[in-house]
Amino acid sequence: MIDITLLGTGGGMPTPERNLSAAILNYKGRKILIDCGEGTQVSMKISKTGFKNIDIICITHWHGDHIVGLPGLLATMGNSGRKEPLTIIGPVGIGEIIKGLTVIVPYIPYELNVIEATKESLCFTINKENLLLSSKGEIIINTLEVEHSSPCIAYRFDVKRKPKFNLEKALDNKVPKVIWNLLQRGGNVEFEGNLYESSMVLGEERKGIKFSFVTDTLPIPELIPFVKKSDLLICESNYGQDSDVDKAIKNKHMTFSQAAQIAKSGEVKELILTHFSPAIEDPEEFIHFAKDIFPKAQIGKDRMIISIDFQN
């Protein structure tokens, strides 16, 4: 199971009801923060999500409402005794932005590993201490360049699930019992002059979890295959009414109905709308624009928690 907590659902500027863009993914006690807008630390405190186990921060782009909370969070992590490296992922150019932001945080007592997102997937293995970049892993982070007024990327998180041990296969393949546990972890094992593969003891691959996060973009066609069959899509919906579509095009954002159409065309299971313009006092007033297209659409609220279970 994974948990996603919306820490901020506002866009442009904070309001009394909404902090700026941020969400946190929790899997097996390790955490990935997505964006870090103003108010992120306060929302973490209220929701009790904490920041000590954050291994990766994924930044969609460097507009202030998505990143201005980052220097303060980095400082708080350092002041709280963090020594472990922290990975920051973002669009091309994020490295220079991080350098600029950290001018006001001159001392960071841990390593920052900045990855300017490529078109290749990033795989991470997970253990009790951290998430580590590797050639294979339980969590795969995928990115897509979207269309906004600055370089911006959407994220998809594929959480893999290990196949079950298959006793019948292990016996049929005459795999020595002493190496069963090693093979269950994946990879090959050489034993007494013979090479054994993990596929010799494991069953079929099981369905994992797919979570997509899309913000600050026009509804480009490439989004549909990118979010295809996601268990959850969190998608920006800066404008509520269909009559605001010209504003959305001008500012390179989406309306409620455009976000819903992405969800419908992408055959996602659940849609949470976020990144509401400060001009929208109550997003629920406009939810029918989304539900008419995608009935499972919901309004995202600060500190809302969404849990997704593995199936079967």
Curated annotation (Swiss-Prot):
GO terms for molecular function: 3'-tRNA processing endoribonuclease activity; zinc ion binding. This is Ribonuclease Z. SUPFAM superfamilies: Metallo-hydrolase/oxidoreductase. The active site is at D65 (proton acceptor). Belongs to the RNase Z family. Zn(2+) 2 binds at D65, H66, D216, H275. The lineage of its organism: Bacteria, Bacillati, Bacillota, Clostridia, Eubacteriales. Keywords: Endonuclease, Hydrolase, Metal-binding, Nuclease, tRNA processing, Zinc. It is an enzyme of class 3 (hydrolase). Its EC number is 3.1.26.11. Its cofactor is Zn(2+). Zn(2+) 1 binds at H61, H63, H148, D216. CDD domains: RNaseZ_ZiPD-like_MBL-fold. It catalyses: Endonucleolytic cleavage of RNA, removing extra 3' nucleotides from tRNA precursor, generating 3' termini of tRNAs. A 3'-hydroxy group is left at the tRNA terminus and a 5'-phosphoryl group is left at the trailer molecule. Transmembrane segments: none annotated.
